[in-house]
A protein has these predicted regions:
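A conserved beta-strand element that flanks and buttresses the S-adenosyl-L-methionine
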Residues: 103-105
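A short glycine-rich, Lys/Arg-flanked "PGG" loop and its adjoining helix->strand segment in the class I
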Residues: 119-131
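A short acidic, Gly/Pro-enriched loop at the edge of an enzyme's catalytic core
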Residues: 94-101
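Conserved class I S-adenosyl-L-methionine
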Residues: 1-45
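Class I SAM-dependent methyltransferase SAM/SAH-binding core
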Residues: 49-92
Length: 161
């Protein structure tokens, strides 16, 4: 299920304000060299398109494509018209051997919960990749149990969960 904050244009417009600038994100520092070395890139769950916009601003001259099911987020992404933005999910597209690199940043992969969802997503990603293509993603490590620190952090900010 897509959260309302990602579909509502007014809320999606605020999303990037709550994130570090793309040039200061550790995950983007990891992903950007991968994007820059790939001819054609698909960002699954691209959100507002910050990573693809950074790649284009950094000189990527090839094909950049963002896929996201949240229309509000894509409306923000579409501020950059030299990148293809697709409204949908992996089940709604049928790319065949079109991308050198597929990425899923910001823990987007953890949206797949059930085994059949994971298998279907991986099959769609594999189909979208050219021979020798790469898939890069990250997800939270449940063994770290980061959520246990959240109440303390939120309380220190004078807020509540």
């Amino acid at each position: 299920m897509i959260e309302r904050k990602f579909t509502d244009d007014r809320l999606a417009a605020l999303y990037d304000a709550f994130c570090p600038p793309p040039t200061r994100r550790d995950d983007f520092a990891f992903y950007l060299p991968l994007l820059m070395s790939a001819r054609a890139v698909l960002d699954v769950g691209c959100g507002t398109g910050a990573l693809l916009r950074l790649a284009r601003e950094s000189g990527h001259a090839g094909r950049l494509c963002g896929l996201d099911p949240a229309g509000g987020m894509l409306n923000q992404a579409r501020r950059r018209s030299d990148i293809a933005w697709v409204h949908g999910d992996l089940a709604s597209v049928g790319w065949e051997r079109e991308f050198d690199l597929v990425v899923m940043t910001g823990h987007a992969f953890q949206e797949f919960v059930a085994d059949d969802e994971i298998r279907a997503a991986l099959a769609a990603i594999r189909a979208a990749l050219v021979g020798g293509g790469r898939f890069a993603f990250e997800t939270r490590n449940p063994l770290v149990r980061a959520w246990e620190r959240w109440p303390r952090i939120v309380a220190a900010l004078g807020a509540r969960l």
